[in-house]
Each structure stands twice: as C-alpha cells, then as structure tokens.
C-alpha cells in the first residue's frame, strides 16, 4: 500500500529505538510503523485514496508524524538504561536526578508537538553488540536528521549568563562535540529546565550569543565548523578540535569519533588505548594523511607511532611538518639553485625515488612507513640526564630529550616521513578558520599562533599548494623538492625491534626532535637516494 510504503521509507532513517513521548514507552521499528495506523490522519488518507492518490500529502503527513528530537547531555551516575526503561513508562520512573532529566526531556519534546524522542541512555540496548555498533556509527546521521536537539546543561543555574556555556561541563565532553556539530537545530536548557539566557528563539545555533560562546569554547569560527563534514578528510583539524575533550571510558576517545570520520570499527570495551590506535590506523590507511604521526609524547599499545592519548593533537599545525613555502619564496630559491653547481642529475634521481613511494598504510598493527632514513652515529649524554646528542652525516649534531637510555639501543635512526610535504601533495591545516586571538580568552589559548592566522576561503585555487598553481618542468620540480628538504623538520626516532630485526619501533621523545639537512653535496645526495625506503614499524 502507498501509505505503508511511505511509512517504511520514513522509519528507515530513524533510530532503531525511540521514546513515544505521548505514552512514554520505548518502541522499536515495527511498533513505530504500527503506531501511524492508529491515527485519525491515517484513516483520512485511506478515505482520500478512493478517488485520488495524493503522494505529496501522504509524504507530508507521514514525515510530519515521524519528526523526532535528540538529547545531548553529560552522562551521570544511575542513568536509566534500556534494560530498565523497556519494562516501564518513562513518566513512571521512580524519583531521581537522572530520571527527572529524562522525563523533562520527553515532556519538553512532547509539548513542542513532537511524537518521538531519543536518548543515548535508554534507546541503545548496549547488551546487543550489533545494536551498539550500529548506534555509534549512525549517531551523527541521527542527530543531523532530527527536528531539534535538546541540550541539558547540568551545573548551569538560572539566571544563566554569557560564559556559562563555555565553562559548562557539557562543553568538555567528547560525545557532545559531534552531537552539537551534527544537529541543525539546537536548544539549550539550564539545569532547572529554563531556556539558557532566556533565548526564546527556535534555533539557538543561530543566536549571536551562542555562536560567540561556541567559537570561544573551540577557538574556531562557526563558519569553519560548518565547513567540516563527516568523512576521512580534514583529519588533523577534527583531531585538534576534540583533543581537549574528555571521556569517562578510555575507549570512548575513539568511539566518539566514529561518526565524525564515517568509520566503522568493532566496538570492544575493555581494549583501552587500542581503540584509538585502531581508529588512527584506519584513518592513515584510508587517507595517507601523515599528520597523524605528527605528535610528541608516549605511544600507545597498538603501534609505537600512534599515541596513547588524543590530547597530543592539540596543535592544528604541528611543528613536525615544515611550513609550506610561498610561491614567491620558492621562485627565488629555485632560481638560485638552478644557477648553482648542484648535481641536477642526482637531484632528479632523488625526486624520482620519492615519487615512487606509496602512501603509508597499516597491515594489522604493522605500519608500512615511506620515509628517508638517517642513521645516528655515536650517542653521548649531555650534562642533563635526559638530553642526548648524536652525530649524523647529513643532519649534523642532533639533540634528543628522552627518558630512555639511548646508548643501550644497538642502533638508532631518525626518519623524515613527511614525503607529502617534500612533493607538495598534501598541505596540513589549510581549511580551518581560527578566531582572532583578541576574540578568545585563555580557555582556547591552546590553539597555536600560526594556526590563528589561517582564514577560511571559498576559493579552491587559494587552498592549493603553490606548485600546483602553475606547470613546471621535471627539473624545476626536483629543485623544489631539494628546497623543501633543506627546511627544518621534526624527525621520528626509530630503533630495530628486538624480536624482529626487519621491523622498527618508535622511541618516545619528550620534545620535538628538530633537524635539518645542512648541505646538498653529491655525497649527501647519494646517501639520501639510498636512504629512501619503506620501513615496517611495530
């Protein structure tokens, strides 16, 4: 029947379980579909079909009925879960702070004329692994498809004032970032369920006060946030935005990003930081974005080149990757190189070797890392117990700060993994628009100064790397590679794995290892050519 087909089309995009705000019951898809047939509008549509099938009217009435609201809040102790609420009417739950929170959410949604509501506390049967997996991936889609998202600000009391939202605990949580970002319409409520700052407008996301506070909380402009879409793009920007947000469970640092990146991963609570490792490994494999490797600190249990905590991505433009050279600078430098005594044939060979490299990828927990390798010579400790110095042929004397006792390692290598930078293929951090420094307070000061100067632009030509804006011959392209190779870069410190000499592990450093190719002699060029390879990193 035409009406039932329209109903099935409508509920296909709905969450698996919804709260019927009238009855207070949890209903699955079959019950959601059946509920429409009990409405007077259903019988009116049936009667009207005796003479003419009005498809537009059917679609309008069905879609109007299946509008739903989503809930965004910070989880608390003793939340009403699916296994409890499935047996009882929401409005009959015994008195408690968390029960009252759910009941008020449902009442506000019901009073707004919406029949359906969804809360992550009771609308996900977390005991069903398939259902939990589906929900974590589909959540962004559900928030985007909602008529409104109700945000509950526990701890924000009436009368609320500007700044309360910025300081709220809701604004520190990992899950709430995607919930706010994905929702088209949002309304904020204080903890007594009055409107935040008495903003009696349909959509708080359009309020200048809210826009200003969210920019202050993230350090990023509203327009730039709107430009971000789910998918494996702008990876560094997204990781940066969530890097300071918190989760109760370690695994949720990764699982809360599945929808943002449109990635499906097996959900295994109890795996700890392996979850973040699996997420980052899949992102690196699908995108080839080496900015995922640009961090300093302790590595996780999944792979030594992936961190244990997402907070290491707090810098939008990581100093590990050299800054892009402007076209004017490049023209000046390469013109000088072209007239110098450099061995152009060796430079061309190096350029060819780099171009042949694949993008990095993972096979299980093993990373295939394209890079240029620099072997460290003798290592000695400086006056500081945690600072070591070593000699390398092409990089000169290198200083490394680490808790590790470097002399105990049999051999050590510094690697240059930023091949995309050398070939000008993938600039990092070229889209996010940063709020000017004077417009934000100290709470967003973790955004780097260099990042603040970036402005969003709708002109795709201006986002392209300089070398793609004009055609050059192969020799000029090779000279540009040499120019970039001489820029300071953050190297990764690797050592052969003790149990597998064909593989390597990253050695944790406390600070950035900044190095630079000092001179481009024929001997150095030959060493560089022979040092271009793909390493197995565990």
Identify what each model region corresponds to.
Residues 1-64, 69, 73-112, 126-130, ...:
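A structural "flexibility-hinge" signal
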Residues 117-125:
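Conserved hydrophobic ligand-interaction patch in extracellular adhesion modules
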């Amino acid at each position: 029947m035409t009406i039932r087909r329209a109903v099935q089309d409508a509920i296909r995009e709905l969450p698996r379980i919804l709260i019927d705000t009238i009855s207070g019951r949890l209903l699955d898809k079959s019950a959601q579909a059946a509920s429409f047939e009990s409405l007077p509008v259903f019988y009116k549509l049936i009667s009207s079909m005796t003479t003419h099938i009005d498809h537009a009217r059917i679609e309008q009435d069905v879609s109007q009925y299946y509008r739903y609201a989503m809930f965004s809040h910070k989880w608390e102790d003793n939340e009403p879960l699916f296994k409890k609420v499935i047996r009882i009417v929401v409005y009959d739950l015994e008195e408690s702070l968390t029960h009252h929170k759910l009941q008020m959410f449902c009442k506000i949604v019901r009073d707004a004329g919406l029949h359906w509501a969804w809360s992550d506390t009771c609308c996900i049967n977390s005991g069903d692994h398939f259902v939990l997996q589906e929900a974590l991936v589909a959540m962004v889609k559900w928030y985007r498809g909602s008529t409104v998202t109700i945000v509950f600000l526990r701890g924000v009391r009436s009368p609320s004032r500007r700044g309360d939202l910025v300081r709220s605990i809701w604004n520190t949580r990992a899950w709430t970032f995607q919930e706010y970002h994905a929702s088209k319409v949002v309304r904020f409520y204080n903890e007594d369920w009055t409107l935040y700052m008495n903003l009696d407008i349909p959509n708080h996301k359009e309020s200048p006060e809210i826009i200003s506070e969210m920019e202050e909380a993230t350090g990023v402009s509203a327009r730039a946030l709107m430009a971000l879409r789910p998918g494996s793009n702008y990876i560094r920007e997204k990781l940066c935005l969530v890097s300071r947000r918190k989760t109760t469970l370690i695994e949720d640092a990764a699982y809360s990003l599945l929808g943002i990146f449109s990635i499906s991963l097996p959900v295994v609570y109890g795996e700890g930081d392996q979850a973040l490792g699996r997420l980052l490994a899949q992102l690196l494999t699908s995108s080839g974005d080496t900015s995922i490797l640009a961090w300093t600190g302790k590595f996780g249990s999944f792979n030594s080149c992936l961190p244990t905590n997402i907070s290491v991505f707090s810098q939008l433009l990581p100093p590990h990757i050299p800054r892009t050279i402007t076209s004017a600078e490049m023209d000046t430098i390469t013109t000088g190189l072209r007239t110098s005594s450099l061995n152009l044939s060796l430079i061309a060979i190096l350029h060819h070797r780099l171009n042949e490299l694949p993008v990095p990828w993972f096979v299980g927990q093993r990373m295939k890392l394209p890079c240029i390798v620099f072997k460290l010579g003798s290592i000695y400790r400086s006056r500081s117990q945690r600072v070591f110095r070593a000699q390398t042929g092409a990089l000169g004397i290198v200083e490394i700060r680490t808790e590790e006792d470097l002399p105990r390692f049999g051999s050590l290598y510094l690697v240059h993994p930023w091949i995309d930078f050398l070939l000008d293929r993938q600039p990092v951090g070229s889209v996010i628009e940063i709020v000017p420094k004077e417009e934000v307070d100290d709470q967003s000061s973790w955004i780097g100064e260099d990042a603040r100067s970036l402005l969003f632009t709708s002109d795709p030509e201006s986002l392209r790397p300089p070398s793609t804006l004009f055609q050059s011959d192969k020799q000029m392209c090779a000279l540009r590679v040499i120019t970039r190779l001489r820029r300071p870069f953050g190297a990764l410190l690797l050592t052969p794995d003790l149990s597998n000499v064909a593989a390597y592990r990253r050695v944790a450093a406390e600070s950035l290892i900044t190095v630079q190719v000092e001179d481009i002699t024929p001997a150095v060029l030959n060493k560089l050519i022979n040092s271009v390879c793909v390493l197995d990193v565990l």
